Amino acid sequence: MSRFTWIQTGALALSLIAAPAAFSQTKKAADGAAEWPMFNRDLGSTRYSPLAQISTKNVAKLARAWSYKVGTQKNSGSITGGSEVTPIVAKGVMYLTTNTDVVALEPETGKVLWTYPASGPGNLSRRGVAYWPGDTNNPPRVIFTMGRRLIGLNAKTGKVDPGFGNEGEVNMGVAYDSPPIVYKDTLVVGANTGEAPSVGDPGNTRAFDAKTGAKKWEFHSVPQPGEFGHETWEGESWKNRSGVNNWGFSLSVDAERGIVYTTFGGPNTNYWGGDRHGDNLFANSVVAMDAETGQRKWHYQVVHHDVWDYDLPPAPALLDVVINGKKVPLLVQTAKTGWMYILDRVTGKPVFGIEEKPVPQSKVPGEQTSPTQPIPVKPPALARNSFKADEIVTAADTNEEHAKFCRDLMERSGGFTNEGPYTPYTYREAGAAPHSTILFPGSIGGVNWGGVAADPKLGYVFVNSIDEASIGWIEKKANGSAVQYDRNSVVGPTSRFQWSEGNPRSGNIQGSGEHAWPCQRPPWGRLIAVNAKTGDFAWSVPLGVTDELPEGKKLTGRLNMGGPMVTAGGLVFIGASNDRRFRAFDSRTGKQLWETKMDMSAHSIPITYQGKNGKQYVAIISGGASALDDPAPPGTEALMVYALP
């Protein structure tokens, strides 16, 4: 679907580690190792940096080098409130978007090189920019989105480049809030469509010429008559269907084979599919297509007929590993489902097995859920996918106030029903007493847009997951509503306990912010390393602390949004958790080696880069300002940059 639908909590921010080109430093720098030239650092979306100056031996000494304010946005109360920008570093310059401008900075100091004040229709991307290196006839360009507009700036001057599109602009047709991925002279973008109604803008993936801005191709995310997969939409349900979009922050490309991989979310509407019987391709799928033509090569659908809002937000990571003596080209895809799908990226076939397993069926009028869903044999689930009554939080886990709230919530909800993975929401007749499904993972995951980082040398894939429920039922909506059936619950959009020191709040509050705790026993968030050679967990640790709890109980793991990056120095860096921390872990063992506390949580992707001074830096956007966080004082959203003394 579009970003996040019915949500219990939310916040976003981007962790970054930038990498400017150090022209006269080392051979590594000359080879591009010093840079972070795109959102996920490379076309394969590994977020792996070969820099190793900062290592397991010295990371404990990491200290703030400089910072740069990126905005004054106030808490919006929604999951999309704060900055999610990942800066990029290309040819010795850092580029990023703030809340109002596109800026170029000196990556060693934060000195402003130029500023482009964004204006006109559409919202400036809160996720960053792309860099195209130019050619003999065109200068290097910084390319970004504003609603339906794709805009190209001269990377050296920050001025609009009139040679791109129509005086520097291209109309994409559908809004997109992320930077395009740049492959050779092709720009590929997703789409941000609404959550409802079922008809509206298409979620198609599109490509444009990086030189001229001309449209190159468009892939129909909902197959049209005569196209592969059209029969998975019964009757006329395909017509003008919205959703089924790549709303995430990037795509991936196998440069050797010229294949671009796009992912799609579920169809509109989120929780009822009675007007769209069938498996609904290419919803909830990863699709491999020819980067030059947009022609489908293969697809893999991870959820059939989605009625849980189980999108595939992140780009897949591409890496090669040796399995049973043979080099295998892997594609590693995560999703809100809480599973990791490891496929051969050339054929689309599962590497460790994925089985179609029977799942519970919906009793909502008109609904026809799929009798089976694809469940990986390996790796194990990354997030909780079931719930039993004795797994509700107790005073021994946190405190009595929290435990009582959760017991009361279960009672007010009419009890909790859970039948394991893909439990359908219960149906509530008008006037009937409430009885609620408790669904794990909930609608924020699982694994959300933060995705994974992959170390191709070690063969490990790193991912942060969320153990958070959605609670409620499906009910018929009044005539005139945008949907016939939709979700509801006894507590509105959230179902978490809000803690206030000395004054626990009653159960009718929204349960948002840093002091809102889930009702199942911890951990509530984890950082996991998966051995891509075997499909097994290498290690798993709680990610985040609850400061209000006493020693011995603090390490609960936290709700998180954002993702990791990994370096040749043996380190995994990640913000993401809503406890205002930025951390470094040993990539081999999962041992935490460093942390710093910031003004706001960093729901973003970190980056690392080497400056022209030969020093390695680590950077991340500390943005907060959403429903995962407490309200932020104006001006606290910042780019935070760290280095060794």
Across the structure, where does each feature detected by a protein language model lie?
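Mature N-terminal segment immediately following signal peptide/propeptide cleavage
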Residues: 26-73, 86-89, 111, 528
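Repeat-blade elements of multi-bladed beta-propeller folds
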Residues: 36-40, 80-100, 123-149, 176-197, ...
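Extracytoplasmic/lumenal domain signature
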Residues: 58-71, 102-123, 133-136, 149-173, ...
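N-terminal secretory signal peptides that target proteins for export/translocation
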Residues: 1-5
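Short helix/loop capping segments that flank catalytic or ligand/cofactor-binding pockets
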Residues: 198, 217, 261-263, 270-271, ...
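N-terminal pre-domain segments of enzymes
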Residues: 23-54, 370-407
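Segments forming glycine/polar-rich beta-alpha architectures that bind adenosine-containing cofactors
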Residues: 431-467
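Bacterial N-terminal signal peptides
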Residues: 8-19
